[in-house]
Swiss-Prot record:
Disulfide bonds join 224-235, 268-282. Its EC number is 2.4.1.207. Catalyzes xyloglucan endohydrolysis (XEH) and/or endotransglycosylation (XET). Cleaves and religates xyloglucan polymers, an essential constituent of the primary cell wall, and thereby participates in cell wall construction of growing tissues. The gene is XTH12. Residues 26-215 form the GH16 domain. It comes from Arabidopsis thaliana (Mouse-ear cress). This is Probable xyloglucan endotransglucosylase/hydrolase protein 12. GO terms for biological process: cell wall biogenesis; cell wall organization; xyloglucan metabolic process. InterPro entries: Beta-glucanase/XTH, ConA-like_dom_sf, GH16, GH16_AS, XET_C, XTH.
Amino acid sequence: MAAFATKQSPLLLASLLILIGVATGSFYDSFDITWGAGRANIFESGQLLTCTLDKTSGSGFQSKKEYLFGKIDMKIKLVPGNSAGTVTAYYLSSKGETWDEIDFEFLGNVTGQPYVIHTNVFTGGKGNREMQFYLWFDPTADFHTYTVLWNPLNIIFLVDGIPIRVFKNNEANGVAYPKSQPMKIYSSLWEADDWATQGGKVKTDWTNAPFSASYRSFNDVDCCSRTSIWNWVTCNANSNSWMWTTLNSNQLGQLKWVQKDYMIYNYCTDFKRFPQGLPTECNLN
């Protein structure tokens, strides 16, 4: 292993949504820094955002808009060096006790050991759908693009355009799918050394603080979004758009490559965790 490693009715959608075709501008326009007491900052006229973590606090931000389906890109440069115990989270989530959520979490490690990408999908407040991966590059050396493509057919997680995971809409087989709760984008840098690195065996070395993750090139040009409950600004849901995208044959090959060579945990093969039987979708995918 590498070292661094049910289609909804268009009429229904149209009743909710209208057309957006412009790329997002600066981080000032798209996000609010929500916590961290000055540890998250925007630079370069809104083109760069950084989150920092020290022993006192981490930091985070969230999108101004909500999304109901979308193709959302963010370039992230992760915490370099000894990042053990740190988590850089980048995810979409709705509100309430029965929330939906689509997660990227980047689990730090000691110097020279690989980051872990932790992914999960929550529906109606229920998760337990973790898949974890190493990467085929050093994610701290430069910015790389992390994408969530979420439409009525599937949720696709991509890294630099390469799919690493697909969660399909299997509602017809009794599997819940996030399709009705708008979500905001959230990101944060925080400490979780009780579980994040090697199951909590390696703790955060605070002599390396402050830790910092950087963000560029946020893009939500292909999305269904709203700025308030009464003001939907939305997407082109025609048959040729991202709204009905699934993996093509080349992407399926890429997915198989990643899952063969870089996947380190798959809930769908964890029989000890699910002694009464694997979740339904595991037998369908």
